[in-house]
Amino acid sequence: MSERFVRIYEIVMKYEGGYVNHPNDPGGETYKGISRRAHPNWEGWRLIDQKKPVSEDLVRRFYYDQFWLPLRCEEMPAPVGEYLFDFAVNTGIRQAVKTIQMAAGVAADGILGPITMGAIRRSDVQVLMYKFLAHRIDFYVTITTQRRRQFEVFFLGWIRRTIEVFSLLMSQK
């Protein structure tokens, strides 16, 4: 695992709790942000069901294999790949890719192909990061206003995380 991944993983884990089963979360049961509904075959669920500890290595490996690598974060300039990873952990890969596509000015189809990667690589990193920040906030505003009763409990936490991670990543450039 790369240094870039390890650094952003540690940041993201500050925002992802241990075991959570919030009734308003469409992801249902989660462990350190891993949704049982989205990832029912993750081996950590077996350990949790048996009341056994889940190693940090198992969680880290999951995020590396299921998020960092498919998102091709290492191929993106820092801190764009890191910010994309953070958003994907919270919203899922498809939504995160659509959002970075909007920020990069390409069709938002949720597919991370050569057009999207080219647009990301050609972008001014600082400008792209500010656009990505704005699109992330807009996403949270939109889903919260559409399903207020379900999501308003999460809204301020989402916005806080979005801004804090952005600020931290931009200060490390």
Model-derived segments and their meaning:
Residues 1-173:
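Cell-wall polysaccharide-cleaving catalytic domain and substrate-binding groove, primarily
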